[in-house]
Design a protein with these regions (language model features):
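Conserved class I S-adenosyl-L-methionine
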Residues: 2-60, 71-72, 89-94, 173
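C-terminal alpha-helical "lid/dimerization" subdomain adjacent to the S-adenosyl-L-methionine
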Residues: 23, 35-45, 158-219
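Class I SAM-dependent methyltransferase SAM/SAH-binding core
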Residues: 61-63, 67-115
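Short glycine-centered segments of the SAM/dcSAM-binding site in methyltransferase folds
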Residues: 81, 152-154
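A short acidic, Gly/Pro-enriched loop at the edge of an enzyme's catalytic core
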Residues: 114-126
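A short SAM/SAH-binding and catalytic strip from SAM-dependent methyltransferases
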Residues: 124-137
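A short glycine-rich, Lys/Arg-flanked "PGG" loop and its adjoining helix->strand segment in the class I
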Residues: 139-151
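C-terminal lobe and adjacent flexible extensions of AdoMet/dcAdoMet transferase-like proteins
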Residues: 220-228
Length: 228
């Protein structure tokens, strides 16, 4: 392989901000919700053990950001006061149906991750799985999460992330990003989300890397941060 080709692979092809091509097309949001609902079974097999461990000791007032079709509801403790904030009407319909099916109380609000409709220091924990890949501004989202968490409150997350820079998988993620963003509600396949979380100002960050099924979204992180 030539030195020039090596240099091309080492250069991160992903811009720090989404381009026009990677912004979600709102008319396709119902399709994105339908696809995510159909993929729940596949995702559940990959994430089950991580969710059980991550959510086991949750208590108090909990906010889930971007709950989508309700894939986490079966894993969240039943005695928490749960509020779900979801911007997509199609996702909210699936989520409401899932909550009824499971027979669990749920406050469902329309909103975005960058402007969470909660007062400062009012929440015991925030749950966010497979969401930071698709928000318009991950740093602003994490700042909002810090804002609403009480001192000592926790942010719990599972996210698919970028492969190592210079790898063939990273290049494949870059190539796949426009398609994922278009059909999966703005999903970015190549965000270095672990760096954004580390820079978000939490007093403690614990995370681990893991891999799921083969594909461009195989690299993942799971973890917990603590607010000051």
């Amino acid at each position: 392989m030539s030195a020039r080709r090596n240099a091309d692979l080492d250069r991160d092809p992903s811009p720090s901000r989404p381009t026009v091509a990677t912004r979600p097309l709102r008319p396709l949001r119902p399709l994105a919700a339908w696809l995510m609902k159909r993929l729940e079974g596949v995702d559940d097999a990959d994430y089950r053990r991580h969710k059980r461990a991550l959510f086991a000791d949750l208590s108090g007032t909990i906010v889930e950001i971007g709950p989508g079709t309700g894939a986490n509801l079966a894993y969240l403790p039943r005695d928490i006061a749960l509020t779900a904030i979801e911007p997509s009407p199609a996702m909210r319909r699936y989520l409401a149906e899932r909550a009824i099916e499971l027979g669990r109380p749920l406050t469902l609000l329309e909103g975005t991750a960058e402007r969470i409709p909660f007062p400062d220091a009012s929440v015991d924990a925030v749950v966010c799985t497979l969401v930071l890949c698709s928000v318009a501004d991950p740093a602003a989202t994490l700042a909002e999460i810090r804002r609403i968490l009480r001192p000592g409150g926790r942010f719990l997350f599972i996210e698919h992330v970028a492969a190592p820079r210079g790898s063939w998988l990273r290049r494949a993620q870059w190539l796949a990003r426009p398609c994922y963003a278009c059909f999966l509600d703005g999903c970015h396949t190549d965000r270095e989300t672990w760096r954004t979380i580390a820079d978000a100002g939490f007093v403690q960050v614990q995370l681990a890397h893991f891999r799921t099924h083969p594909g461009v979204t195989a690299p993942h992180i799971v973890g917990v941060t603590t607010a000051g």
